[in-house]
Amino acid sequence: MPDPLVNRCRPLPAGSTLCILGAGFSGRRLASLAEAMGIRVITTRRKPDPGSNALPFDSANNLVPPASAFEGVTHLLSTIPPGRETSDPVLRTLGPLLQQQPLRWVGYLSTTGVYGDTDGQWVRETDPPKATQERSRRRLACEQEWLNSGLPVQILRLPGIYGPGRSPLAAVKAGTLQPIDKPGQVFCRVHIDDIAAACLHLMHCSAEGHHPKVVNVCDHEPAPSALLQRHAAELQGCPLPEARPFSEAEADMSPMARSFWAENRRVSNDLLCKELGYTMVHPNFRSGLAQCLEQERLREQQVPSVAG
């Protein structure tokens, strides 16, 4: 099936090579789109799947691709998160090698978590980061390391990422999802289609002289998680339990889940969409969930049935 994003994205100049360090959920989507556009793509994974062309890269275990693998790379995206170390794992292991490549654009996927809690107020790229979680502070340190690297770096700050196979649809259908109500609380999100398409758009903007150091990549509509879950139920004609008050649910949450609910912010995408001219593929969760459902149903149809 042809990639529907191909016709809305401009190809990179002839002879370009895109390297994606950490081709997981988001990185694989960019790789598949770029390949569909005829762009030469190199990817790495910590543990590549059997039969995959991805190169193994695991800095924690000193598993690094050979220098020859990076020859001629013109565009690079790192999705690799910080470990518990104080330095970025990519720059620590590949920094000198990357300096030798003809790089025109380097993207680093970070998190809007670096803004911290704004009590539901809007934040832009010009607002100073106020990270409250340790994982966000590590991200912020890596952002600065990339910006100080001397490479043509652009930081892409992402909120919650979703897409086919990673959305509330399956849990809603299975009846295992319990909505939670916390008045005034919203979450921001972005579909993987928009991560991939925005990366390509930003590569072109940079080539044309528009290269802000930090760009928020998120949809137009911050919304309560229960609203998203109700829509997922409506799309599938499934019942959804009544939302449980956050004051009751908090005691049963893991520390990680509690940390997500501890921060409330609305992230602006005005720089990306109004100033840099990007048009969202999925401007809100309704568009994104509809695409997820369509793709997940197509995948179910393609799975061969097993004879009894």
Question: Where do the PLM segments sit?
Answer:
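Catalytic helix-loop patch of NAD(P)-dependent Rossmann-fold dehydrogenases
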Residues: 119-155, 180
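Substrate-positioning beta->alpha
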Residues: 164-171, 180-204
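Conserved Rossmann-fold NAD(P)-dependent oxidoreductase catalytic core, especially the SDR/UDP-sugar
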Residues: 95-134
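Glycine/proline-rich active-site loop of Rossmann-fold NAD(P)-dependent oxidoreductases
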Residues: 140, 149-151, 161-173, 201-215, ...
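Mid/C-terminal beta-alpha module of Rossmann-like enzyme folds, strongest
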Residues: 198, 205-257, 304-308
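Amphipathic terminal alpha-helices
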Residues: 283-308
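NAD(P)-cofactor binding segment of oxidoreductase domains
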Residues: 71-108, 141
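Conserved C-terminal active-site "lid" loop/helix of NAD(P)H-dependent oxidoreductases
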Residues: 230, 250-279
